[in-house]
């Protein structure tokens, strides 16, 4: 029988960080949102997606039905490698529903400056209709984290991104210990990059991941804006995706966590309302709450918000990046 496995369980931890120390645990994708592993003849699972994702598939029609129920007009599809190389599938989705779905291109981040990946990006944008690119530093796992976003091998990639005039959606996704120290160092790297690439529009996805990393800490420590994050987001052309319901997913009902209201207010005061963008992480969000409920914090709570400000957070600001 399968036994539930927590994400930080030592079974999944190699001797060091990177693909060279990847443990052999017979990894496989299961059903009902589960990832499965075997260790010492015992099978384990991790609940990665909600159980409602029976066969780990989400058709565009399924997403559109969810959007209609939640009152969402358009969606941005963040194309992380962990979902697979979905260039053709997502390309078909956005061509079929161009007024509903915006696609982000994908590259192998550690090889992004190589001709093959440059051609791949050009094809996704110019032929398949992708309008931005998703870039996760988790990709550096494939080279044992021996490079970063400011590596000179990526210069040709950034030049192409600027030439194509597309936004970058960033994920500080190394996710290795010491967790907070690495996360803050990644934000520092992004800030260095931002100052050298001021013509490229950027969105920091999975905003305020520090909240998730600091579980168990006092609220006064956990629900703080890191100084480096504020500094990064003050760069021109930088915005942040607010996914606060997942960062505080251990609380009973995140939209009613008053610490999150305070963070939204602090962000407005520090960087301005025009840089804030709601993100759901659908279908992942349904491990915590429904797609519709992921909007509650911005549509119903945060009493200091005007209606115009609510509209900007829940689509208006993103609409400026990807107008119809």
Language-model-detected regions and their locations in the chain:
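Active-site metal-binding loops of divalent metal-dependent hydrolases
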Residues: 1, 80, 207, 280-282
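Short aromatic-enriched loop/helix-cap "lid" or pocket-rim segments at secondary-structure transitions
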Residues: 2-9, 88-89, 117, 145-147, ...
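Alpha-helical scaffolding within the catalytic cores
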Residues: 58-63, 85-91, 115-121, 186-191, ...
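Active-site gating/metal-coordination segments in enzymes
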Residues: 73-74, 78-185
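Catalytic pocket-lining loop regions of alpha/beta-barrel enzymes
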Residues: 131-132, 140, 147-277
């Amino acid at each position: 029988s399968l036994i539930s496995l927590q994400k930080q369980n030592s079974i999944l931890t190699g001797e060091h960080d990177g693909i060279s120390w990847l443990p052999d645990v017979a990894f496989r994708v299961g059903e009902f949102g589960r990832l499965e592993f075997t260790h010492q003849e015992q099978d384990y699972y991790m609940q990665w997606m909600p159980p409602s994702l029976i066969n780990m598939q989400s058709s565009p029609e399924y997403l559109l039905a969810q959007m209609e129920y939640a009152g969402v007009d358009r969606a941005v599809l963040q194309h992380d490698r962990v979902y697979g190389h979905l260039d053709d599938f997502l390309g078909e989705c956005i061509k079929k529903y161009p007024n509903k779905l915006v696609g982000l291109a994908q590259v192998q981040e550690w090889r992004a400056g190589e001709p093959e990946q440059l051609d791949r990006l050009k094809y996704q944008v110019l032929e398949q209709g992708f309008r931005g690119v998703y870039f996760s530093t988790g990709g550096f796992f494939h080279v044992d984290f021996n490079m970063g976003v400011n590596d000179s091998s990526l210069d040709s990639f950034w030049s192409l991104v600027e030439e194509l005039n597309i936004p970058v959606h960033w994920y500080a996704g190394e996710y290795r210990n010491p967790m907070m120290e690495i996360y803050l160092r990644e934000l520092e790297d992004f800030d260095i990059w931002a100052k050298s690439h001021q013509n490229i529009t950027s969105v920091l996805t999975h905003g305020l991941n520090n909240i998730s990393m600091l579980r168990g800490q006092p609220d006064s420590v956990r629900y703080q804006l890191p100084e480096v994050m504020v500094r990064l987001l003050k760069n021109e052309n930088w915005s942040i995706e607010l996914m606060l319901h997942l960062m505080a997913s251990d609380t009973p009902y995140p939209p009613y966590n008053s610490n999150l209201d305070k963070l939204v207010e602090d962000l407005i005061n520090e960087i301005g309302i025009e840089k804030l963008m709601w993100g759901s992480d659908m279908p992942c969000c349904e491990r915590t709450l429904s797609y519709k409920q992921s909007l509650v914090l911005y549509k119903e709570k945060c009493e200091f918000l005007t209606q115009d400000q609510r509209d900007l957070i829940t689509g208006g600001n993103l609409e400026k990046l990807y107008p119809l």
